[in-house]
Regions:
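Extended, subdomain-level signal for the structured scaffold at the beginning of enzyme domains
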Residues: 1-125, 137-226
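Active-site cofactor/cluster-binding pocket
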Residues: 128
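Catalytic nucleophile serine of serine hydrolases
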Residues: 133-135
Length: 226
């Protein structure tokens, strides 16, 4: 069985603002826990490879199921300390790519051309591009075979402008995902703030916020099984 590639951030701070950020842990662990239940193997990649920092704000929402994955030596090693570099990955090995969030991704996901190429090749091979919350930033600049934005004309979701305001981070991030999706012709679909929501449009599956990671995983598993 082909694997699923989980994309994580290397970003430690909010740009020049010396405040810690990184991966929102539950967005990775809840997703990979569902993959494990379905016997779907995963690999972990980051823009630079290696160390993946954790967003301390996300640790306030850690549950027992999140901890059960976090404590696994395999997860600590392959996801948090020795994630793969893009150059170490063959897109042909994967049936889907999943962009986990955390505010850190706003700095190192959107303009990473290596990750864009990997995602585009998975998509062109019939695979799925998926994301949750801020992870949608990784989809913004992926192009299709004709050079158009992949998200143009597609129904997708991600962390909303309202949620960014409620989080108190609107002035700390370099852009707003909802605005950038719409600039590129994407149809940004949203529900109530901080409520689970996932939407699929063909080979794109996206979740709105941290509480949607499990739903994204389940939707992907269902799509793969068809």
């Amino acid at each position: 069985m082909k694997k699923v590639l989980v994309v994580l951030t290397n970003t430690l701070t909010y740009g020049a603002i010396n405040r810690p950020t990184g991966l929102w842990l539950g967005e990775a662990t809840e997703f990979v826990a569902e993959m494990a239940k379905a016997n779907i193997p995963v690999d972990y990649i980051s823009p630079k490879g290696g160390f993946v920092p954790l967003d301390p704000r996300g640790m306030k929402y850690v549950t027992d199921p999140i901890m059960s994955v976090y404590k696994q030596p395999d997860f600590i090693r392959r996801a948090l300390t020795s994630s793969l570099k893009p150059s170490q990955v063959d897109p042909n090995d994967y049936q889907a790519i999943y962009y986990a969030g955390g505010h850190g991704v706003m700095w190192d996901f959107p303009n990473n051309t290596e990750l864009q190429t990997i995602a585009a090749r998975i998509y062109q091979g019939g695979g799925y591009i998926t994301s949750v919350c801020h992870g949608v930033a990784g989809l913004l600049n992926i192009r299709d075979a004709q050079g158009h934005y992949l998200i143009a004309g597609k129904n997708i979701t991600g962390f909303t402008t309202a949620e960014e305001i409620l989080a108190g981070k609107k002035s700390s991030v370099p852009f707003l995902n909802q605005v950038e999706v719409e600039k590129r012709g994407g149809h940004f679909v949203k529900k109530r703030a901080y409520k689970e929501f996932v939407i699929q449009d063909g080979q794109l599956i996206t979740g709105q916020n941290p509480f949607s990671a499990k739903a994204v995983a389940k939707q992907l598993i269902q799509a793969i099984g068809k």
